[in-house]
Amino acid sequence: STCYLSYLFKKTTGMNFIKYLTSYRVDMAKNLLRTTKLKVGNICEMVGYSNVSYFCQIFKNHTGMTPAQFRGSKL
């Protein structure tokens, strides 16, 4: 069942699926920001978001900085 699968996922990874997916997307975006000169809007779409401002909000919640700040920081 869906509930059992969700339980197993959380037991295995330590986080629910949505948090895992968000973390994965932010990590992919960080890599693209470090290694490409793509616009934030393009990266947003590539990692699965359709709204740039929402993506920037999620990114900032996870990293403490906006995508543009992250790119400029050379982290």
Pin down the residues of each PLM region.
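Short coil turns linking two alpha-helices in DNA-binding domains
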Residues: 1-2, 50-51
